[in-house]
Amino acid sequence: LFEEAIDWVELDENGLMSGPILEPASRIPEKELNPATLEPQLNIEQVYQALVSGIRDYFGKMGFTKAILGSSGGIDSAVTLAIACEALGADNVRAILMPSPYSTEHSVNDAVALSKNLNNPYDIVQIDQVYNSFLKTLDPLFNGLPFSLAEENIQSRSRGNILMAIANKFGYVLLNTSNKSELATGYGTLYGDMAGGLGVLGDCYKLQVYELAKYINRISEIIPQHIISKPPSAELRPNQKDSDSLPDYEVLDKLLYQYIEKRQSPANIKEQGFDAALVDRTIKMVNNNEYKRNQFCPIIRISPKAFGVGRRMPIVGKYLS
């Protein structure tokens, strides 16, 4: 008996109202209120320039002048350091190398070589003593239990504390080096390697980080080739590799892109040929780690679906499929 009505006003080229003011809802033409997210249009040079501008703009507007970051000898910290040096000047970016009992010698050497190539100041701070002190303190509780993620994360959080202490003492801003693939899957330690005041690579998938490294090296080798070619590893336990915990990035990044940027359902992603079990596992990781991303620092946005400002999701994602 009743049909809702909508005020539908059309203006002609002179700004005058034309047509009926009131129409039944069934006669109102359908309008797409939420257009589909646009495909990313940035090439790798534009991504690089956007990140440089993002750091420079953020620091300039906030009145910051100097940055600090943890330099591990890995691809993420290497790319972040190179971009920060371009944005702020090498003299204003301090790299802190923090080897642990599980750090390889080549990672330390790679990190040193990188800072020498960039001509930025760096320091080496061993965390063995801090790490062992934690283990000794926790021994009454951990005694007899096998080595696990808890011991791994102590190393990461020790580094986070050291970086923040130096930042506080000397007035630096800590740059975070986590990439979008890691943030999506929760492959990071809260209050450890997720600490920071600005996430430089937080909207860049892992494969984009490799492309950025190649772009940075387009004229001469700034990032040592060994950093680019070696298998990525957090080096928190013997012989650790990212592939122990995550799918291959060639597959993972494409899957994540379909779920996050394209907003495809698990069923649609599986129809594209992705392994069903891998899709379920990956999407579960994404949904279950919203609480981590909710505590992450601001991210430089280069896509329509950057975590935080571009993708608002409830922390409890149990209902998501």
Regions found by a protein language model. Give the residues of each.
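CN hydrolase (nitrilase-like) catalytic-core segments centered on the catalytic cysteine
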Residues: 1-7
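ATP/NTP-dependent adenylation/nucleotidyl-transfer catalytic domains that generate, transfer
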Residues: 12-73, 77-321
